[in-house]
Amino acid sequence: MATKKKMLQAAAGNAGGGAGGLDVESVFSTYLYTGNDASKTITNGIDLDGEGGLVWIKQRDGSTQRHVLYDTERGTSKTLSTDRADAEFTSTTRVTSFNSDGFDLGSSSQVNGDPSNYASWTFRKAPKFCDIVTYTGDGNDNRTVNHNLGSSPGMVIVKKTDAADSWIVWHRSVPTGYLSLNVTSGLQNYTSRIKSANDTTFTLGTSGQTNSSGANYVAYVFAHNDGDGEFGPDGDADIIKCGSYTGNESSFPIIDLGFEPQFLMIKSATSAEDWLFMDTMRGWLTDGNNPNGDFKVLRPNTANGDGGSFGVNITSTGFELTSASADKNSNGNTFIYMAIRRGTKVPESATEVFDVDTRTSGLPSFKAPFAVDMGLVRKGTNTSGATYNANRLTGTKFLYTYTTDAEANDSGFVWDFMDGWANDGVANSTVISWMWKRAPKYFDVVAYSGDSYSNRDVTHNLTVKPELVITKKRNSSGNWEVAAKITNTNYHGGLLNSSGSLVNTSLNVSGNAYSQFSDNHFQVGGTLNSSGDTYIAYLFASLDGISKVGSYTADGSAQNIDCGFTSGARFVLIKRTDTGGNWFVLDTVRGIVSGNDPLLELNSTSAEDNGYDNMDPYSAGFTITAYGGTSPYLNISGGEYIFYAIA
């Protein structure tokens, strides 16, 4: 962010104002749901009633229902379809209400058929993000239409609403022509539709597709943030980018957005190819390079449902092309895109970002009040068995926490649920999942590929310095490398898949794995940066009242561990560091009680041990009970321990 902007924000803060801006979660949502042939309320946190916006819906599992658009300027009863040039039509059974936290649906199969699955994307009107304008054409050249973005648009989409005509798209990267959203055609080099755009207006030509005298139009105006975004906790984040790249089938393009995206639209401006929608809720992955289709795309110019695609990887700073594909990366062709940042909201309660559940009937298999980004699963706590680790970025791939094995596949590890994760078998109370949602200052997930350089910087989006980092090679054998912060300048290093001690003098564990941590990157080398290998890293931080990474020295007597919580810890991970000791997991679903507490070990396949009273509830955190025959693990006098706790 520019120095002048920082100074202005600081001045506003000192004067009693706030430097914070709107979070992504307040202005954009991808929300998936299953229809019910009746009425349905979609609660996605977007204030459409008070602020206005656009709702875009598509059936995912069929090709009979089109992309349909509704906005607060035209009203709930007016439907437009992007794969057709048709005029809007009136219906009272599709979107029936715009609410302060989402929208309501009627019984139409176009938006709510039972048991069809649907995707919805909601764009709230907000400066420097999105605006919606309706206007009546006058047929005059250089007609200007006002908008309220407060910045120059990145993309403008115009549709005549009272008669049939093509959807017209103007994009800042190809400003001398237009594209049509309802067809595959490449750029048409004519300026008679939309001629230009600035921070207050866009200018029309004389074409009837955008400016026929007496005709009615709607324009969806999307911003492009270029270091001038005013979003996120500090009011300085860019959240939407409209840009372009040139296809290269041998040296694949890497697009640096300055943020990790959750939504991406791509279109070839050179040749006749489909428009593509991909998002992380429907399975856009970090290594979608399988020609059989690793992730799902929807195509606004067709009525087709989710189709397999490949060749676009998410990165922590943008996206990269990984294959030669005519619709994404054909040699020399120009491709335009619009990308929207993943969430920026700092959680206010631990229940927003962490939960524990046993496997239940119905879908998803593990329920949570949020869309899960990372899960640990223990399949059978009462018998010996493995703990599985999976995450949204790598899809159905999983790793065992107790071994060095490469990742494998479980088709039941799916993530397209708003309230949990997995389609993984029948109800079983001995199968348990610990579930995390990514959020700034709390938890982040980073997938990266090695390049063999020492002290290689890997960007993360935790926004604070991580206090616990766990990284594993994915594509072949490799240890789970751990670094845990003990003091401001000292980390302990070790292995999650081992009971061995953690080294407390250097980060240079197992081949100089880690070398530095900051609020936006960590440095790796050696075993965590082999050329051509793929890795997954989990980053954890202490967040007041929500999570705590800490340490304690045991003295054998009962000890209260103050984490700054108010209702006790629901999850605790503990490891002795000065000598051998297992990675123990306790949680309130299995029991943190004034009595025996079941212990599971991430570094082994042992059945849970419920023969000892190791921990008692404590409102500010947890209590380590006195050492003895009933508590032999977590309080050995003189022992040094690290822990990670969640309220």
Regions found by a protein language model. Name each.
Residues A2-A647:
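Surface-exposed molecular-recognition determinants
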